[in-house]
Amino acid sequence: MLKYDVIVIGGGHAGVEAAAASARLGVPTLLITLKPENLGEMSCNPAIGGIAKGTLVKEIDALDGLMGYVIDQAGIHYKMLNETRGPAVWGPRAQADRKLYKKAMYQILTNYPNLDILYGKVEDIEIKSSKIEAVILNNGSKILCQKIILTTGTFLSGLIHIGQKKIPAGRVDEEPSYGLSNTLKQIGFKLARLKTGTPPRIDGRTIDYSKTILQPGDKIPRPFSELTNIVNVSQINCFITKTTSETHDIIRENLDKSAMYSGQIEGIGPRYCPSIEDKIVRFSTKSEHRIFLEPEGLDDYTIYPNGISTSLPEDVQHKLIKTIPGLENVKVLRPGYAIEYDYVDPREISVTLETKKIAGLYLAGQINGTTGYEEAAGQGIIAGINAALAVKDQAPFMLTRANSYIGVMIDDLTTFGTIEPYRMFTSRSEYRLSLRADNSDLRLTELGMNIGVVSEKRKKIFTKKCEDIEKIKSLLNTLSLTTSKLAKMGIQVAQDGTYKTVLDLFKIPNFNVEQAIKIFPMLKETQNNNILQLLYIEAKYASYLTRQQADINLFQSEEAQFIPKNIDYFKIPSISLEIQEKLSAHKPTTIGVARRIPGITPAAITAIIIYLKTKYSDGSST
């Protein structure tokens, strides 16, 4: 009988990161997927990154994950979103060639040390004494294991809707999983339904691009991965069009035929990625909605019209598309659809992503109520790391709100839960100025090195980068000019007769890296504008970062105050019954987590701290 230490079920974005992370830690790992050729499949939009999402990708890369490196092998349109705003909200994004992305992912995983891939379908999980024993395949065979990571995406009782038509599926042409849904229900997990959707796909050869707006990418693509020196993939343009009043009329006239508005769908859809039906209803005063025409590949004429996700009948979809400028004669290759699926209340898992009910069972991705490739991948890498560390009897790996967007996401999910698909935003992070895309490796790579999940190659690159940062920082502190010379150059500085270093100049409004290079041409020789940009940001926002660090220190002190597992909140007399019940249900692990539970008052937190000091003064936490 086959036996593995860790088995990952599902080969989507969460699954591939989970499997690779577990394998990197030297643990024999098996990835079970319905179609190995679809590893890392982009089921919806052909793009990676975006605002906040791009930071997640950089954080995954910092821990030696796959997503950033793979998109650099397949990215055909790179664009830094929000670049005209502050660096805390910059969002690196890349349009992908779907085929190249899957090909690169497949090549990496099929040659990954300590990782095997099995074509198959898991029907059940064998559990004894609330511990994982094995997975059972649909052919009746059993594979023994210590840990299981469920990354089922939209496959748990998945149901596609196109108008009144219902198709049982995890995605187009792939069977759903009913067995695992039943298993989770029998265990006692709280399941609910969510919904997501995708737009119709259209033939780019039939688009009149003269009626659209050109959207070029960045002149020089900025790679996602620290392992990528330069993006060698050919770059192409995207285009923008918009809906019209006629489009909106057709949608309104047919709302009763939409699966979303006929009452056919139970699941709640993503608030921040609404269907075109939702947009017309919720924003009824808007006369138009933008549509981004995104190519799906270099040698693929399929276009993804981002912005018109729909569950309307096929004939209605054809009608509404014809009313969009440039798409009057377009050929529809595949209709859009909505899909609903089961998910588990994420308050059923801990911050390690292990379930509270079953030891050794981890959940990652859409099964936890999230939406998006990047959110799934971020959970996958943490679940994979922790499953492997548990096999090795090592301490768990936990990111926090203070050091990563991944930590923010996991804390939000495990503390508050979600009743709609959870998407990452910069606004969710209190410390977003410190948690930028450009410093992800400086925040997380050393943490990954400490637990052994980072390769030797990445270690060398990271060590060299840290050395270069110190060298360039020293140079920027050495290069200087008098205030009088700077004034002659048109740079507004106080005429106090002092010398101003480059780091001083970076603090001046509207002064940037390009100006510094113009004044001090030797900075060109550093040949690393990424480091110059990093140091520019750190200098420009130094005072804000210092204040934010004080907030982070306070947060970390509360996170370090652990709450014993066996604490009885009903024995703390100064706390109301309502709060006692909430704390007992949530089981917070630290004072910081307890403070973030809705309805927990500052007075209650003080009472807990006093109780812990008197009851557990010996440091006991059992």
Swiss-Prot record:
Gene Ontology cellular-component terms listed: cytosol
Cofactor(s) named in the record: FAD
Pfam families: GIDA (PF01134), GIDA_C_1st (PF21680), SAM_GIDA_C (PF13932)
SUPFAM superfamilies: FAD/NAD(P)-binding domain
SMART domains, per database record: GIDA_assoc_3
Binding of NAD(+), residues: 269-283
Coiled coil residues, start to end: none
GO molecular function: flavin adenine dinucleotide binding
PROSITE patterns from the UniProt entry: GIDA_1 (PS01280), GIDA_2 (PS01281)
GO annotation, biological process: tRNA methylation; tRNA wobble uridine modification
Keywords for the protein's UniProt record, in alphabetical order: Cytoplasm, FAD, Flavoprotein, NAD, tRNA processing
Residues annotated for FAD binding in this entry: 10-15, 122, 177, 366
Chief place where the protein resides: cytoplasm
InterPro entries: FAD/NAD-bd_sf, GIDA_C_N, MnmG, MnmG-rel, MnmG-rel_CS, MnmG_C, MnmG_C_subdom, MnmG_C_subdom_sf
Subcellular location(s) of the protein: Cytoplasm
Protein family according to the UniProt entry: Belongs to the MnmG family.
Function: NAD-binding protein involved in the addition of a carboxymethylaminomethyl (cmnm) group at the wobble position (U34) of certain tRNAs, forming tRNA-cmnm(5)s(2)U34.
Record's subunit section: Homodimer. Heterotetramer of two MnmE and two MnmG subunits.
HAMAP family documented for this protein: MnmG_GidA
Protein name as it appears in the record: tRNA uridine 5-carboxymethylaminomethyl modification enzyme MnmG
Organism per entry: Rickettsia rickettsii (strain Sheila Smith)
